[in-house]
């Protein structure tokens, strides 16, 4: 009866994937998986070597708040609206050895991690994963790299990048407070970074980046340099030493649930050949 109830609610595919992989990774949405992978690769974290295209992830973000018939069918198919605990417990009734990890957004609410039991849920201390790499300097460098540096409009384009970015920082981060914005701009690099992190800890920086790319496209013409869902491409432009230690801690958690990949000689990768 438990098997029938679980399969009816979550769908057989959820059970099959959990049985094959031995774990479930709970994230807000598909872009989180892309960002975690990009961060792992940028940091050279060991978990990057275990990554494959069959990540068993479950998206907990409820994209369908209105419970019409279509939304309800979508919820049952994809699991939207079900908490990680409900989903994991339903599957673990069938798979007692199942491991679970949730890496979820804080959303500015000081959510507390849960580390006891087979399902561990950790929250980003900042608003979301994007808050660990999106900065004005990064957006400026990325945008500049996407336009010709040696044509007649190069200086005009750079001016547009700076002005769009400054206007956005002033309004979205400093709430229009010109004096505070000026202090941030004139601060040393270290002080500027600390102030940026403090001011944006509870702000959704993915939205900030999307607004920047939209504003820039309107200003200089042409298409968006990056669309929603492509922000993980920015990670390649981040100096590894600038990525907070917390990111590595989250990746360490991920390494604990990912299965060890076997080399062609049958030796676990990263463990060496037994003596």
Language-model regions, residue ranges each:
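Activity-critical C-terminal alpha-helical subdomain
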Residues: 97-203
